[in-house]
């Protein structure tokens, strides 16, 4: 099911497309009407998913119907404490809008509800939705997922992913940029990032051409805005009811940064600067001439006058990129009753990632201030990291705390994530401690946590017990330190997940 959006004229973020007709969810006639008319009611056994809407895992259709034992559960208000969301597997939706493992996903959602999880995070990939040709969007698989989450009683956070996933076509989790974008990059390689050695990085389009019509007459910012606008129009019945938050991708891994080595490197400032495509170099030359700075081809001395100028320009370019996307997203989702999220990297080589941090300068403060200006929530990963487990010259735990302090200083709502999905008891406790570190320093705290991510191992008995206990502890952390008893739900969920662990693949 492909949806062609109305045409747009101009770059202005205030120009909104006409409302897309209601046909995007015509495939789900019962859902299309129930989203608007839904009222919490007494639970009863109801068959709500027919084989037409949710065929079995084999994809053969058949006549089998899936019944939720208690019918559509009422969506409760925000739980006390810190809400926990769970990010779905990367390959949940495949090419052509195919939802994989539907039957297992239904059982998984039931288990999450029983454990007290608030909702799920759904990554919506640009390369899948607008993959075939520009301006043609296929949301079918994601519509199914959101509908399933609604009927299971889960809320949804949508992550609009404008970046590449995986290392290449041989990677089982490989999702490239849209094919038509890759064709344009093949014609003009400078659309992609490049370091001083000419090595290209195709994770994300170079921000040097943000406002240039390099994508078949549209600029990258226009393409991102059109995608967000079509998402809003397609999912309007769910926004503010089921979909409560939208994270907007701003760079590699969805984070507002340049491509950069991860924290696996020994030093914080290593990594090559990603500014050697012709568009970035043209901007650098123009800024240098305007500032009266003598150009230097090799930025070897970052402490010198040119080095300081270069780092300010490099970080300002990143901030301007974030500003453009924030402006578009705020305009598009202004009346949608969802909060918008931006993500930063906390476990990267700071200077090459675009975070100009020194002993007297905090590179995260300008970003947090920008997010606060637009009412965005700030997302940061690595909440489970303990320095005792790290052998590096710079504290990785300190990275995360630096981001949290910036959010606290700017009074920005916070969303935490783990970077390693295999968490032990100490790691879960560190997540709680890190969450409290932010929470205790904010006058009107707003915090939630995304567990990254759902997998077969998550539902193994010992891991599931550990996870459900973590969710319970997170629910107990609030201003009044309420002590809530979720024991019954947790015990029920243990037995209901053994089959999921076996079926997941």
Which residue ranges define each predicted feature?
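Substrate-binding cleft of secreted/luminal carbohydrate-active enzymes
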Residues: 157, 161-165, 364-505
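Hydrophobic faces of well-ordered beta-strands that scaffold small-molecule active sites
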Residues: 82-88, 118-122, 156-160, 244-248, ...
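Polysaccharide-binding and catalytic clefts of secreted carbohydrate-active enzymes
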Residues: 182-369, 376
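Short, acidic/polar
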Residues: 94-113, 356-367, 396-400, 434
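N-terminal chloroplast transit peptides
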Residues: 1-53
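N-terminal carbohydrate-binding accessory modules
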Residues: 37-114
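Aromatic-lined substrate-binding rim segments of carbohydrate-active enzymes
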Residues: 102-202, 222-244, 264-268, 332
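The substrate-binding groove and active-site-proximal loops of carbohydrate-active enzymes
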Residues: 89-99, 123-139, 203-226, 233, ...
């Amino acid at each position: 099911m492909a949806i062609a959006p109305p045409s747009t004229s101009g770059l202005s973020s205030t120009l909104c497309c006409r409302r897309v007709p209601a046909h995007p969810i015509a495939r789900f006639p019962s859902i299309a009407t129930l989203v608007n008319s839904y009222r919490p009611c007494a639970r009863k056994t109801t068959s709500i998913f027919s084989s037409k809407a949710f065929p079995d895992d084999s994809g053969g259709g058949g006549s089998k119907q899936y019944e939720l034992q208690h019918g559509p559960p009422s969506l409760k208000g925000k739980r006390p404490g810190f809400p926990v969301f769970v990010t779905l597997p990367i390959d949940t939706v495949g090419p052509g809008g195919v939802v994989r493992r539907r039957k297992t996903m239904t059982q998984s959602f039931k288990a999450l509800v029983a454990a007290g999880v608030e909702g799920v995070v759904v990554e919506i990939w640009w390369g899948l939705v607008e993959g075939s040709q520009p301006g043609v969007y296929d949301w079918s698989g994601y519509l199914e997922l959101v509908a399933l989450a609604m009927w299971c009683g889960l809320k949804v956070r949508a992550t609009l992913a404008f970046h590449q996933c995986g290392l290449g076509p041989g990677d089982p989790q490989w999702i490239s940029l849209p094919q038509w974008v890759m064709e344009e990059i093949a014609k003009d390689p400078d659309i992609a990032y490049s370091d001083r050695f000419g090595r290209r990085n195709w994770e994300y389009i170079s921000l040097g051409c943000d406002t240039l019509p390099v994508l078949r007459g549209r600029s990258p910012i226009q393409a991102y805005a059109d995608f967000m606008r079509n998402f809003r129009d397609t999912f309007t019945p769910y926004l503010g009811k089921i979909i409560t938050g939208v994270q907007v991708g701003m760079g590699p891994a969805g984070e507002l940064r340049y491509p950069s080595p991860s924290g696996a490197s020994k030093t914080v400032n290593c990594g090559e600067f990603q500014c050697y495509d012709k568009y970035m170099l043209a901007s650098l030359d123009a800024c240098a001439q305007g500032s009266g700075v003598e150009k230097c081809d090799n930025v070897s001395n970052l402490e010198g006058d040119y080095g300081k100028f270069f780092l300010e320009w490099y970080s300002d370019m990143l901030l301007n990129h974030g500003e453009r996307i924030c402006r578009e997203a705020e305009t598009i989702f202004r009346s949608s009753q969802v909060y918008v999220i931006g993500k930063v990297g906390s476990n990267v080589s700071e200077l090459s990632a675009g975070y100009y941090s020194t002993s007297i300068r905090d590179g995260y403060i300008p970003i947090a201030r920008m997010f606060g200006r637009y009412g965005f929530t700030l997302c940061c990963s690595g909440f489970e990291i303990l320095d005792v487990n790290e052998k590096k010259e710079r504290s990785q735990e300190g990275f995360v705390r630096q981001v949290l302090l910036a959010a606290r200083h700017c009074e920005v709502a916070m969303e935490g994530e783990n970077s390693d999905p295999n968490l032990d008891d100490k790691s879960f406790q560190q997540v709680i401690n890190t969450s409290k570190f932010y929470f205790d320093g904010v006058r009107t705290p707003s915090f939630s946590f995304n567990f990254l991510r759902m997998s077969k191992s998550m539902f193994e008995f010992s891991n599931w017990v550990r996870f459900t206990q973590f969710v319970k502890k997170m629910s107990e952390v609030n201003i009044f330190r309420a002590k809530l008893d979720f024991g019954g739900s947790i015990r029920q969920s243990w037995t209901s997940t053994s089959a999921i662990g076996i079926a997941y693949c």
